[in-house]
Amino acid sequence: MSTFIAVINFTDQGVRAVKESPARLAAAGKLAEALGVKVKEAFWTLGQYDMIVIAEGPDDAIAAWMYKVGSLGNIRSTTLRAFNAAEMQKIVGKMP
């Protein structure tokens, strides 16, 4: 399974309904499970981004999940593929 980090900003619609944000995350988590994605951590943040979500799953399942969640109109996200130390060691081990 791959690890992804999503940095999220609320849209105007999302911030107007910010009180619903915890419930939206719970619903997104249920959708994630149905797609074979595990939400490992989620944080609401102050500063440049409104939330950070760390999830694991197959690449196509993460993509489907993030597209669906984004299509609801409450967030915009940038999703990053993340590598732990063991994965990075394998990657650099393949370098000539």
What residues fall within each predicted segment?
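A compositional/biophysical signature of low hydrophobicity enriched in polar/charged and small residues
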Residues: 1-96
